[in-house]
Regions:
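Acidic, PIN/NYN-like endoribonuclease modules and their adjacent C-terminal/linker elements
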Residues: 90-116
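Active-site-adjacent beta-strand anchor residues
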Residues: 25, 82-83
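Acidic catalytic patch
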Residues: 51-70
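Domain-level signal for Mg2+-assisted phosphodiester chemistry and nucleotide/NA-binding surfaces
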Residues: 1-56
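Short, surface-exposed amphipathic charged segments that create phosphate/polyanion-binding patches used
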Residues: 37-38, 74-75, 113-116
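Acidic, metal-associated active-site segment
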Residues: 65-81, 87-96
């Protein structure tokens, strides 16, 4: 998301939440590593994403599940929000009463529901 739209995800999350900790589920890292093997825009964006995760020292969280289920698992473990634009993941998160942060207008993040 940051690469395609030129936003600073850390700054945007701080604007929305104040002081926060970014946790990246291993399910996400595995998915992004696969995407990084592709040629073109997708591969470059994924490679940059992996670089950001490493350089910023974001905390990684081991997940028993893969894909969307791993993201939900991590959010439930820490009572956190999910950052995504994926419609199916947003719907699953809403059903579980998890807060969802998404890209709005191509230049800012917005929260669908307040964290409880």
């Amino acid at each position: 998301m940051p690469y395609q739209f030129g936003i600073n995800i850390e700054r945007e999350l701080s604007r929305l939440l104040g002081v926060c900790r970014i946790i990246v589920p291993t399910a996400v890292v595995e998915e992004v590593e696969k995407l990084a093997q592709q040629d073109g825009e997708v591969g470059r964006a994924a490679t940059l994403g992996l670089s950001i995760i490493k350089k910023r020292g974001f905390r990684l969280m081991e997940c028993a599940h893969k894909g969307d289920d791993g993201v939900i698992e991590a959010a439930l473990k820490v009572d956190g929000a999910i950052v995504t634009n994926d419609k199916e993941l947003k719907q699953k998160a809403k059903e579980l009463e998890l807060s969802v942060i998404y890209l709005r207008g191509g230049n800012r993040l917005e929260m669908e529901e307040e964290l409880l």
